[in-house]
Amino acid sequence: MKSEPDELSIHDLQRLGRARWDGVRNYQARNFLRSMQAGELFFFYHSSCPQPGIAGIGRIAASAYPDPTALEPDSHYFDAKASAEKNPWSAIDVEFVASFPGVLSLALLRSQLALSDMALLQKGSRLSVMPVSAEQWQAILALSSEGR
């Protein structure tokens, strides 16, 4: 799951303990978000920043529910077509699990053969929520434990 650190960083999540992940406005990313269940782990990726990369691990605290920001006119994520009865967007609650000693950079991730087919690394991939296979998960955990 990707977030811009000035919106929500791994350190913000650590301080808060739990936060709402909202503002997903792409149907494919929304569907990935909706498929996540309480207790599942995810990699927290810092995007659109000087050092993009995987910064830590979070846990899904509660299954998806209608995203309230879609109904808030002052929100950057407001959707004029959404209503309380028909809100196509979802939010999810997340919890902090761990931060890595350093961000696992996009360049480092791209250099790993085991991650070559990872959705995040595919050309044109801009989704904020993407699946990670069990093999990819293990490869990234190994990188994080090496202190890269």
Where are these regions (language model features)?
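Compositionally biased, charged N-terminal/linker segments
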Residues: M1-A38, Q136-W137, S144-R148
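Short acidic/glycine-rich loop or secondary-structure boundary segments that cap or lie
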Residues: S9-H11, Q51-I54, P66-T69
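A short secondary-structure junction signal
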Residues: D12-L13, A70, S105-A107, I140-L143
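Short, charged beta-turn/beta-strand-edge "cap" motif at the junction between a beta-strand
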Residues: Y45-Q51
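Aromatic- and Lys/Arg-enriched surface recognition patch
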Residues: G56-K123, L127
